[in-house]
Design a protein with these regions (language model features):
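DEDD superfamily 3′-5′ metal-dependent exonuclease/proofreading module
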Residues: 1-35, 40-47, 57-60, 65, ...
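Short beta-strand scaffold segments in enzyme catalytic cores
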Residues: 52-54
Protein backbone atom coordinates (compact mmCIF):
# COMPACT_ATOMS: atom_id res chain seq x y z
CA UNK A 1 0.00 0.00 0.00
CA UNK A 2 1.23 3.45 -0.82
CA UNK A 3 -0.04 6.98 -0.19
CA UNK A 4 0.51 9.47 -3.01
CA UNK A 5 0.30 13.12 -1.92
CA UNK A 6 0.30 16.18 -4.21
CA UNK A 7 -0.51 19.87 -3.89
CA UNK A 8 -3.32 21.28 -6.04
CA UNK A 9 -3.67 24.75 -7.53
CA UNK A 10 -6.95 24.18 -9.35
CA UNK A 11 -9.19 26.28 -7.09
CA UNK A 12 -8.84 29.26 -4.79
CA UNK A 13 -9.51 29.25 -1.09
CA UNK A 14 -11.99 32.15 -1.15
CA UNK A 15 -14.02 30.72 -4.03
CA UNK A 16 -14.50 27.42 -2.24
CA UNK A 17 -15.06 29.13 1.11
CA UNK A 18 -18.01 31.12 -0.27
CA UNK A 19 -19.63 27.97 -1.66
CA UNK A 20 -19.15 25.88 1.48
CA UNK A 21 -20.37 28.72 3.69
CA UNK A 22 -23.60 28.72 1.68
CA UNK A 23 -24.05 25.20 3.08
CA UNK A 24 -22.86 25.99 6.62
CA UNK A 25 -21.74 29.54 7.35
CA UNK A 26 -20.05 28.54 10.60
CA UNK A 27 -17.84 25.77 9.18
CA UNK A 28 -14.24 26.24 8.06
CA UNK A 29 -13.02 24.98 4.69
CA UNK A 30 -10.56 22.77 6.56
CA UNK A 31 -13.54 20.92 8.10
CA UNK A 32 -14.43 19.35 4.73
CA UNK A 33 -12.94 16.20 3.20
CA UNK A 34 -13.77 15.29 -0.41
CA UNK A 35 -13.39 11.63 -1.31
CA UNK A 36 -14.03 9.01 -3.97
CA UNK A 37 -13.23 5.31 -4.19
CA UNK A 38 -12.32 2.83 -6.93
CA UNK A 39 -13.35 -0.81 -6.61
CA UNK A 40 -13.15 -4.06 -8.55
CA UNK A 41 -16.95 -4.49 -8.49
CA UNK A 42 -20.24 -3.30 -7.06
CA UNK A 43 -20.65 -5.97 -4.39
CA UNK A 44 -18.47 -5.43 -1.32
CA UNK A 45 -18.57 -9.17 -0.60
CA UNK A 46 -17.27 -10.19 -4.02
CA UNK A 47 -14.81 -7.40 -4.78
CA UNK A 48 -12.34 -5.05 -3.10
CA UNK A 49 -11.50 -1.37 -2.84
CA UNK A 50 -8.10 -0.65 -4.36
CA UNK A 51 -7.95 3.17 -4.40
CA UNK A 52 -9.31 5.99 -2.24
CA UNK A 53 -8.75 9.60 -3.28
CA UNK A 54 -9.15 12.56 -0.91
CA UNK A 55 -8.92 16.33 -1.28
CA UNK A 56 -8.59 18.62 1.74
CA UNK A 57 -7.22 21.96 2.85
CA UNK A 58 -3.93 21.97 4.71
CA UNK A 59 -2.32 25.30 5.72
CA UNK A 60 -4.16 27.20 2.94
CA UNK A 61 -3.02 24.64 0.35
CA UNK A 62 -5.32 22.07 -1.20
CA UNK A 63 -3.85 18.58 -1.00
CA UNK A 64 -4.83 15.37 -2.79
CA UNK A 65 -4.03 12.09 -1.05
CA UNK A 66 -4.52 8.80 -2.88
CA UNK A 67 -4.46 5.62 -0.81
CA UNK A 68 -3.49 2.87 -3.26
CA UNK A 69 -3.54 -0.89 -2.58
CA UNK A 70 -0.79 -1.70 -5.07
CA UNK A 71 1.00 -4.68 -3.53
CA UNK A 72 -0.23 -7.99 -5.03
CA UNK A 73 1.91 -10.04 -2.62
CA UNK A 74 0.39 -8.50 0.52
CA UNK A 75 -2.98 -10.07 1.42
CA UNK A 76 -3.52 -7.29 3.99
CA UNK A 77 -2.91 -4.46 1.52
CA UNK A 78 -6.56 -3.39 1.38
CA UNK A 79 -6.84 -3.63 5.17
CA UNK A 80 -3.84 -1.33 5.61
CA UNK A 81 -5.28 1.11 3.09
CA UNK A 82 -8.66 1.23 4.86
CA UNK A 83 -6.98 1.73 8.23
CA UNK A 84 -4.86 4.63 6.97
CA UNK A 85 -7.83 6.27 5.25
CA UNK A 86 -10.16 6.06 8.25
CA UNK A 87 -7.46 7.46 10.53
CA UNK A 88 -7.05 10.39 8.13
CA UNK A 89 -10.81 10.94 7.66
CA UNK A 90 -11.47 11.02 11.41
CA UNK A 91 -9.93 14.50 11.57
CA UNK A 92 -12.76 16.11 9.57
CA UNK A 93 -16.31 17.21 10.40
CA UNK A 94 -17.81 16.72 6.93
CA UNK A 95 -17.16 14.20 4.18
CA UNK A 96 -18.22 15.22 0.66
CA UNK A 97 -18.84 12.73 -2.14
CA UNK A 98 -20.99 11.91 -5.15
CA UNK A 99 -23.60 9.22 -4.44
CA UNK A 100 -21.48 8.03 -1.54
CA UNK A 101 -24.49 7.58 0.74
CA UNK A 102 -25.65 4.79 -1.55
CA UNK A 103 -22.34 3.25 -2.65
CA UNK A 104 -18.99 4.49 -1.29
CA UNK A 105 -19.71 4.67 2.43
CA UNK A 106 -21.75 1.42 2.73
CA UNK A 107 -19.13 -0.33 0.58
CA UNK A 108 -16.24 0.79 2.80
CA UNK A 109 -18.12 -0.17 5.96
CA UNK A 110 -18.69 -3.66 4.57
CA UNK A 111 -15.06 -4.03 3.49
CA UNK A 112 -13.88 -2.94 6.94
CA UNK A 113 -16.11 -5.57 8.51
CA UNK A 114 -14.81 -8.26 6.14
CA UNK A 115 -11.22 -7.25 6.88
CA UNK A 116 -11.84 -7.54 10.62
CA UNK A 117 -11.53 -3.81 11.30
CA UNK A 118 -13.55 -2.13 14.07
CA UNK A 119 -16.55 -0.06 13.02
CA UNK A 120 -15.62 3.56 12.38
CA UNK A 121 -17.86 6.61 12.52
CA UNK A 122 -17.73 8.60 9.29
CA UNK A 123 -17.88 12.42 9.41
CA UNK A 124 -21.22 14.08 8.60
CA UNK A 125 -22.08 13.16 5.02
CA UNK A 126 -22.75 15.61 2.16
CA UNK A 127 -23.91 13.77 -0.95
CA UNK A 128 -23.60 16.02 -4.01
CA UNK A 129 -25.70 13.60 -6.07
CA UNK A 130 -28.64 14.10 -3.71
CA UNK A 131 -28.06 17.86 -3.63
CA UNK A 132 -28.07 17.96 -7.44
CA UNK A 133 -31.12 15.72 -7.81
CA UNK A 134 -33.11 17.89 -5.38
CA UNK A 135 -32.64 20.81 -7.80
CA UNK A 136 -33.85 18.92 -10.87
CA UNK A 137 -36.65 21.44 -11.56
CA UNK A 138 -34.00 24.14 -11.98
CA UNK A 139 -31.30 22.08 -13.72
CA UNK A 140 -33.54 20.09 -16.12
CA UNK A 141 -30.81 17.53 -16.94
CA UNK A 142 -31.30 14.20 -18.73
CA UNK A 143 -29.64 12.38 -15.81
CA UNK A 144 -27.64 13.22 -12.70
CA UNK A 145 -24.45 11.23 -13.22
CA UNK A 146 -21.23 12.91 -12.13
CA UNK A 147 -20.02 13.59 -15.67
CA UNK A 148 -23.40 15.10 -16.60
CA UNK A 149 -23.23 17.48 -13.65
CA UNK A 150 -19.63 18.35 -14.57
CA UNK A 151 -20.68 19.15 -18.14
CA UNK A 152 -23.59 21.29 -16.89
CA UNK A 153 -21.23 23.29 -14.65
CA UNK A 154 -18.60 23.63 -17.39
CA UNK A 155 -16.04 21.40 -15.66
CA UNK A 156 -13.46 19.73 -17.90
CA UNK A 157 -11.56 16.54 -17.09
CA UNK A 158 -8.40 15.00 -18.57
CA UNK A 159 -9.53 11.43 -17.86
CA UNK A 160 -11.76 9.81 -20.47
CA UNK A 161 -12.00 6.38 -18.82
CA UNK A 162 -14.98 4.74 -17.20
CA UNK A 163 -14.63 3.31 -13.70
CA UNK A 164 -15.76 -0.11 -14.90
CA UNK A 165 -13.08 -0.18 -17.60
CA UNK A 166 -10.37 0.34 -15.00
CA UNK A 167 -11.05 -2.97 -13.24
CA UNK A 168 -9.13 -4.82 -15.95
CA UNK A 169 -6.48 -2.09 -15.95
CA UNK A 170 -5.95 -2.67 -12.22
CA UNK A 171 -5.68 -6.43 -12.76
CA UNK A 172 -3.17 -5.84 -15.56
CA UNK A 173 -1.24 -3.53 -13.25
CA UNK A 174 -1.00 -6.16 -10.48
CA UNK A 175 -0.06 -8.92 -12.92
CA UNK A 176 2.53 -6.78 -14.64
CA UNK A 177 4.03 -5.66 -11.34
CA UNK A 178 4.30 -9.28 -10.17
CA UNK A 179 6.10 -10.21 -13.40
CA UNK A 180 8.41 -7.20 -13.15
CA UNK A 181 6.99 -5.48 -16.23
CA UNK A 182 6.77 -1.73 -16.82
CA UNK A 183 3.30 -0.78 -15.54
CA UNK A 184 3.72 3.01 -15.62
CA UNK A 185 0.92 3.43 -18.16
CA UNK A 186 -1.57 1.42 -16.08
CA UNK A 187 -0.44 3.19 -12.90
CA UNK A 188 -0.98 6.64 -14.40
CA UNK A 189 -4.35 5.66 -15.87
CA UNK A 190 -5.65 4.40 -12.50
CA UNK A 191 -4.50 7.45 -10.57
CA UNK A 192 -5.70 9.94 -13.21
CA UNK A 193 -9.27 8.66 -13.20
CA UNK A 194 -9.50 8.83 -9.42
CA UNK A 195 -7.69 12.18 -9.44
CA UNK A 196 -10.26 13.76 -11.76
CA UNK A 197 -13.21 12.22 -9.92
CA UNK A 198 -12.17 13.53 -6.52
CA UNK A 199 -10.62 16.83 -7.68
CA UNK A 200 -13.82 17.76 -9.49
CA UNK A 201 -15.90 17.36 -6.33
CA UNK A 202 -15.03 20.84 -5.00
CA UNK A 203 -16.16 22.27 -8.35
CA UNK A 204 -19.38 20.23 -8.20
CA UNK A 205 -19.90 21.85 -4.79
CA UNK A 206 -21.16 24.82 -6.80
CA UNK A 207 -24.53 23.05 -6.75
CA UNK A 208 -24.67 23.94 -3.04
CA UNK A 209 -24.77 27.62 -4.00
CA UNK A 210 -28.24 27.11 -5.53
CA UNK A 211 -29.60 26.20 -2.11
CA UNK A 212 -29.20 29.84 -1.08
CA UNK A 213 -32.61 30.54 -2.53
CA UNK A 214 -34.29 28.57 0.27
CA UNK A 215 -32.41 30.29 3.10
CA UNK A 216 -33.84 33.77 3.59
CA UNK A 217 -31.41 34.41 6.44
CA UNK A 218 -28.62 34.75 3.85
CA UNK A 219 -30.44 37.35 1.71
CA UNK A 220 -28.30 40.50 1.47
CA UNK A 221 -31.03 42.79 0.15
CA UNK A 222 -34.59 42.53 -1.10
CA UNK A 223 -36.67 44.86 -3.27
CA UNK A 224 -39.84 44.55 -5.32
CA UNK A 225 -41.65 46.19 -8.21
CA UNK A 226 -45.25 46.01 -9.44
CA UNK A 227 -46.01 45.98 -13.16
CA UNK A 228 -48.94 45.32 -15.50
CA UNK A 229 -49.40 41.80 -16.82
CA UNK A 230 -52.05 39.48 -18.20
CA UNK A 231 -53.82 36.43 -16.80
CA UNK A 232 -54.44 33.33 -18.90
CA UNK A 233 -57.87 34.68 -19.89
CA UNK A 234 -56.10 37.82 -21.21
CA UNK A 235 -57.58 39.96 -18.47
CA UNK A 236 -55.12 42.58 -17.19
CA UNK A 237 -53.60 41.83 -13.79
CA UNK A 238 -50.86 43.26 -11.64
CA UNK A 239 -47.61 41.31 -11.21
CA UNK A 240 -45.11 41.66 -8.40
CA UNK A 241 -41.42 40.87 -8.92
CA UNK A 242 -39.11 40.37 -5.95
CA UNK A 243 -35.39 40.98 -6.56
CA UNK A 244 -33.13 39.34 -3.97
CA UNK A 245 -29.35 39.69 -3.73
CA UNK A 246 -27.64 36.51 -2.56
CA UNK A 247 -24.25 36.17 -0.82
CA UNK A 248 -22.48 34.25 -3.62
CA UNK A 249 -22.86 33.75 -7.35
CA UNK A 250 -24.13 30.59 -9.03
CA UNK A 251 -22.06 29.24 -11.95
CA UNK A 252 -24.92 28.97 -14.42
CA UNK A 253 -28.26 30.75 -14.89
CA UNK A 254 -31.34 28.65 -14.16
CA UNK A 255 -35.07 29.28 -14.22
CA UNK A 256 -38.37 27.58 -13.56
CA UNK A 257 -41.99 28.60 -13.93
CA UNK A 258 -45.54 27.31 -13.70
CA UNK A 259 -49.07 28.74 -13.55
CA UNK A 260 -48.40 30.35 -10.17
CA UNK A 261 -44.92 31.87 -10.36
CA UNK A 262 -41.69 32.28 -12.32
CA UNK A 263 -38.23 32.15 -10.74
CA UNK A 264 -34.85 33.01 -12.28
CA UNK A 265 -31.41 32.83 -10.69
CA UNK A 266 -28.54 34.63 -12.43
CA UNK A 267 -25.15 35.11 -10.75
CA UNK A 268 -26.11 36.37 -7.28
CA UNK A 269 -29.51 37.81 -8.21
CA UNK A 270 -32.73 35.88 -7.57
CA UNK A 271 -35.94 37.12 -9.20
CA UNK A 272 -39.37 35.80 -8.30
CA UNK A 273 -42.43 36.95 -10.24
CA UNK A 274 -46.05 36.14 -9.42
CA UNK A 275 -49.47 37.59 -10.12
CA UNK A 276 -51.28 39.71 -7.57
CA UNK A 277 -54.74 38.35 -6.89
CA UNK A 278 -57.22 41.04 -5.88
CA UNK A 279 -60.21 39.70 -3.99
CA UNK A 280 -62.19 40.16 -0.82
CA UNK A 281 -60.48 38.86 2.28
CA UNK A 282 -62.83 36.90 4.52
CA UNK A 283 -62.53 35.84 8.11
CA UNK A 284 -64.53 32.87 9.40
CA UNK A 285 -65.65 32.79 13.02
CA UNK A 286 -65.57 29.35 14.63
CA UNK A 287 -68.16 30.54 17.20
CA UNK A 288 -70.37 32.35 14.68
CA UNK A 289 -73.50 31.70 16.79
CA UNK A 290 -72.24 34.32 19.24
CA UNK A 291 -72.28 37.03 16.55
CA UNK A 292 -74.78 39.19 14.70
CA UNK A 293 -74.36 40.32 11.13
CA UNK A 294 -75.13 43.95 10.24
CA UNK A 295 -76.20 44.01 6.54
CA UNK A 296 -76.03 47.80 6.17
CA UNK A 297 -72.47 48.00 7.46
CA UNK A 298 -71.41 44.56 6.11
CA UNK A 299 -69.64 43.39 9.24
CA UNK A 300 -70.28 41.27 12.31
CA UNK A 301 -70.41 42.19 15.98
CA UNK A 302 -70.38 40.07 19.12
CA UNK A 303 -73.65 39.47 20.97
CA UNK A 304 -72.24 41.20 24.04
CA UNK A 305 -72.53 44.57 22.29
CA UNK A 306 -75.48 43.81 20.00
CA UNK A 307 -77.92 45.45 22.44
CA UNK A 308 -76.70 48.82 21.16
CA UNK A 309 -77.95 48.03 17.64
CA UNK A 310 -81.60 48.15 16.60
CA UNK A 311 -83.03 44.63 16.10
CA UNK A 312 -84.21 45.55 12.60
CA UNK A 313 -80.61 46.19 11.52
CA UNK A 314 -79.09 42.92 12.68
CA UNK A 315 -79.52 39.25 11.88
CA UNK A 316 -77.91 36.12 13.42
CA UNK A 317 -74.59 35.32 11.82
CA UNK A 318 -74.37 32.15 9.69
CA UNK A 319 -71.54 29.81 8.87
Amino acid sequence: MQIITNTLDTYTYHELADILHSYNNTAAVSDFLFFDIETTGFSARNSMCYLIGCVSLNNENFIIKQFFADNPSDCDDEKKMLTEFMHFASGFKYIVHFNGDVFDIPYLKERMYINGLPEHQFPESIDLFKKSKSLSLLFKLENYKQKTIEHFLGINRSDKSDGGELINVYKQYLTGKTLGKNVTSEYNMLLLHNHDDVCNLPFICHVLSYNQIWNEETYKSTSFSITDGYAFNNNPVKEITFSITLPCCVPKDVSYGNDLFYIKLSKNLLKLRTKIHECELKYFYTDYKNYYYLPDEDYAIHKSISSFVDKSRRIPAKA
